[in-house]
Amino acid sequence: CQYVPHKKLSIKDLDPDFYVFSAHKLYGPSGLGILYMKSKWIDKLEPYQGGGSMIKNVDTDSSTYLNGFQKFEAGTPPIAEVIGLSSSLDFINEVGIDKIYEYEKKLTQYLYDKLIKNNDIKIYGDFSNQTSIISFNIDGIHFNDLSMLLDKKNIAIRTGHHCAQPFMKHFNISGNARVSVGIYNTKDDIDYFINSIDEVKKILKS
């Protein structure tokens, strides 16, 4: 889900059985998800819900479904959301995914260089493989308190276990703060973020 808006992806080279991502992570509308599935799994898996446009025949004791992906598309599709996603993909293609990647890579490096200057900030993961996202904690400050005070400065980050509890257990922590950059961010945004962290530390560590 996190990879798609930041870097070019080749399903042919990756060759996954399944691949998923969300429209809102591509600057599109919320409430829409995309699932790529190899044909062998489409044939093997049963629909998880019923509805119109996916049924061949319904009887009192059985049902038969349409073939292929259609058996998973029950009911009225999210038409407006699909149109919105199409527009966001047009936007990304117009800008160029390679340009987006290079811009975000430089911006993330700038953010990383600023963060590691703080001895009380712990960064998680291998930064050499990072794209756009940095997870961290500040010694002596709970990540939720950090998020709450940054919110008052109109800075939105995510905190908690990020639906990745095994990752948190590996580092023996309950959660962390996660900051991400996008094509709409600038170095001025990064500077404001770092300055705001300094202000939060003064408040919570005083």
Name each region found by the language model.
Residues 1-206:
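Pyridoxal 5′-phosphate
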